[in-house]
């Protein structure tokens, strides 16, 4: 078993009708006493020095004769370049090429239905997830494509187009936001109706550790809460900002030497996948943070509960579809790279508002590339006709751009007087300040932003707003 530069040996021992298995380093393999301990003292122990020498000779002879199989293991799932070719590795092996001796050594397990791979019903099961919310189909279409995008994280990164945003699913209590997010994102550990991968009440260190193991998949972080306690709120917001910046910048996080040594992990922890956050609130202030998040809003009643129950009961629908999708990407990797580069060139040549941050433009390019790849897959497999694929592609592109432009419009920096007015409006609604109305006060509804500069004047003591 090769784990980067470390080599471990897995030894199977048959002794007195019982089977024992041990994995350790070579020095352990040649240690006569330790190997005997593996058998719970059932093996006959010959204590003479010649016997021990013969044992070591026997082990060395097995190795020299090559009477073993070699297996290579990675500490994360996802795309690895193996023998010059990109391949997607999971704990059960390489997707699409199960005979290759490569696996990931992770706690999260990949399970799927082999007999349903490339099946029309499997595709339609996934495709119809877009209908989980007919009230806000834009949101569920975005989640569907974000789920597909996540399994290509490394490929986008390889081309210099890192997926530099996270998705936040924000909704009121009982809006089914967590359940909805789970059916779209839970690629691993699908044997039960599992909870989120991790929650915001976990430590920052625990959350950030997850970011490096979920390669080319989505890490779901649940339960962003509106704390009344200012200390808890500040702590949670600090963790939130760190998560958003990590995924937005995709810079490796450095661990301490001591932590790395104790836990046998690398000092540098790269962000390998995508992230979806769920919660009731999302209070972001800095522009640099706001532009790294695409927010999807859900309310109670937006999700079709009957359809949601179907996907909660059919746990293997998502990973079985993804097995087929990833296999297609593996077989057509050069075309996938071409589509990504081509979409970036096309999108960056379009006209967008002059004050629109490049992050939002690149987000459109990233999602556009995924949409094109998805419908290329659907058409090539015969799941959709050429006409049908083009119609859905156009519809999904409009949905995606609407959401991104909506996030841009809500995030753009306003002029100072507009920000003052927005702050005053919030303070009045929350009854944090009282309002004095002058006799000539008029209704402020419907004021245009371009008129704001002519409405506000300041003296040493007062802020005067003229209707």
What name fits each language-model region?
Residues 1-138, 209-210, 215, 288-291:
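Conserved glycine-centered beta->alpha loop in an early N-terminal alpha/beta scaffold
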Residues 82-121, 129-130, 227, 339-467:
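DNA transaction DNA-binding modules
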Residues 96-194, 364:
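P-loop NTPase catalytic core of nucleic-acid-dependent motor ATPases
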Residues 180-233:
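AAA+/P-loop NTPase substrate/partner-engagement loops
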Residues 219-247, 282-291:
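Conserved AAA+/SF3 P-loop NTPase catalytic/coupling segment centered on the Walker-B
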Residues 220, 256, 272-280, 295-296:
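Structural recognition of the conserved hydrophobic beta-strand(s) that form the central parallel beta-sheet
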Residues 236-265:
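Conserved catalytic/switch belt of AAA+ P-loop NTPases
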Residues 269-271, 286-385:
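Phosphate-sensing "switch" segment of ASCE/P-loop ATPases
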């Amino acid at each position: 078993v090769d784990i980067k530069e470390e080599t471990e040996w897995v030894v199977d021992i048959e002794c007195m009708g019982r089977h024992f298995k041990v994995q350790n380093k070579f020095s352990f393999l040649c240690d006569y006493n330790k190997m005997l301990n593996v058998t719970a003292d059932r093996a006959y122990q010959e204590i003479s020095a010649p016997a021990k020498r013969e044992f070591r000779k026997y082990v060395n002879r097995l190795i020299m004769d090559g009477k073993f199989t070699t297996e290579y293991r990675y500490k994360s799932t996802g795309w690895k370049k193996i023998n010059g070719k990109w391949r997607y590795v999971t704990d059960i092996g390489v997707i699409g090429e199960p005979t290759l001796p490569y696996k990931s050594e992770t706690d999260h397990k990949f399970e799927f239905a082999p007999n349903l791979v490339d099946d029309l019903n499997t595709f339609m099961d996934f495709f119809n997830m877009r209908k989980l919310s007919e009230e806000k189909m834009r949101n569920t279409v975005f989640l569907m494509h974000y789920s597909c995008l996540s399994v290509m994280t490394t490929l986008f990164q390889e081309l210099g187009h890192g997926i530099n945003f996270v998705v936040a699913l924000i909704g009121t209590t009982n809006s089914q936001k967590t359940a909805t997010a789970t059916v779209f994102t839970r690629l691993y550990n699908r044997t039960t109706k599992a909870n989120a991968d991790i929650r915001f009440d976990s430590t920052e260190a625990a959350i950030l550790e997850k970011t490096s193991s979920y390669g080319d998949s989505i890490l779901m972080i649940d339960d962003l809460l509106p704390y009344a306690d200012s200390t808890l709120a500040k702590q949670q917001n600090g963790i939130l900002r760190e998560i958003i910046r990590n995924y937005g910048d995709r810079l490796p996080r450095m661990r301490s030497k001591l932590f790395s040594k104790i836990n046998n992990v690398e000092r540098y922890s790269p962000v390998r996948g995508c992230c979806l956050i769920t919660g009731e609130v999302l209070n972001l202030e800095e522009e640099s943070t706001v532009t790294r998040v695409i927010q999807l809003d859900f309310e109670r009643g937006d999700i079709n509960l009957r359809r949601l129950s179907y996907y909660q009961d059919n746990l293997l629908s998502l990973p079985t579809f993804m097995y087929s999708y990833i296999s297609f990407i593996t077989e057509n990797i050069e075309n996938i790279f071409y589509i990504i580069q081509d979409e970036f060139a096309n999108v960056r040549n379009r006209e967008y508002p002059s004050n629109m941050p490049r992050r939002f433009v690149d987000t459109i390019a990233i999602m556009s590339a995924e949409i094109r790849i998805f419908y290329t897959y659907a058409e090539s497999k015969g799941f959709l006709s050429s006409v049908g694929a083009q119609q859905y592609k156009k519809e999904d592109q409009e949905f995606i751009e609407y959401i991104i432009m909506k996030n841009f419009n809500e995030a753009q920096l306003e002029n100072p007087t507009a920000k003052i007015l927005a702050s005053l409006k919030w303070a009045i609604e929350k009854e944090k300040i009282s309002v004095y109305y002058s006799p000539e006060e008029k209704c402020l509804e419907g004021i245009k932003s371009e008129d704001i500069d002519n409405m506000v004047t300041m003296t040493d003591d007062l802020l005067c707003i003229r209707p």
